[in-house]
């Protein structure tokens, strides 16, 4: 069984998965969504749940630096509710403050990735960092693995 880590944006959802033992997170893909049109990519998530034997979801929670919650937190929680309704699998949230900044820094400073390529992989890498941080902290869903 695996966990899926999700970095939910307004146009894309970055997806990462844990290994079966819950030690490492790997990038999977980016799912296009359209919040305004209420297109959330749940069909693709369903395919991933089935093919990867998913036991639960970890969603990034984009809190403000002062620990307050803004509209993106509401959007992430709404996406979590949609997942829970559709799949009936447990959901947990991981503070994702600075993960996109960290992902950007990794791509620019460590991998020297072009700006064009960064846009294609930043959400995947952010999802991977969210899930890896969760696994490292032994989040409550880790017991499901």
From Swiss-Prot:
It comes from the Bacteria. Signal peptide: none annotated. One of its GO terms (cellular component) is cytosol. Belongs to the YqgF nuclease family. It is found in: Cytoplasm. NCBIfam families: RNAse_H_YqgF. CDD domains: YqgF. GO terms for molecular function: nuclease activity. GO terms for biological process: rRNA 5'-end processing. PANTHER family: POLYNUCLEOTIDYL TRANSFERASE, RIBONUCLEASE H-LIKE SUPERFAMILY PROTEIN. It comes from Limosilactobacillus fermentum (strain NBRC 3956 / LMG 18251). This is Putative pre-16S rRNA nuclease. Its EC number is 3.1.-.-. SMART domains: YqgFc. Keywords: Cytoplasm, Hydrolase, Nuclease, Ribosome biogenesis. Could be a nuclease involved in processing of the 5'-end of pre-16S rRNA. Its main location: cytoplasm.
């Amino acid at each position: 069984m695996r966990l899926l880590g999700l970095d939910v944006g307004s146009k894309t959802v970055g997806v990462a998965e844990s290994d079966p033992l819950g030690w490492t997170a790997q990038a999977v893909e980016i799912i296009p969504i359209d919040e305004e049109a209420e297109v959330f990519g749940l069909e693709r998530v369903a395919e991933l749940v089935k093919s990867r034997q998913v036991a639960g979801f970890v969603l990034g929670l984009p809190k403000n630096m002062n620990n307050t919650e803004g509209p993106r937190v509401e959007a992430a929680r709404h996406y979590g509710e949609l997942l829970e309704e559709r799949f009936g699998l447990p959901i947990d949230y991981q503070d994702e403050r600075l993960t996109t900044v960290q992902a950007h820094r990794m791509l620019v400073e460590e991998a020297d990735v072009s700006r064009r390529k960064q846009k294609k992989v930043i959400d995947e890498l952010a999802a991977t960092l969210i899930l890896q941080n969760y696994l490292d902290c032994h989040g409550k869903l880790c017991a499901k693995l």
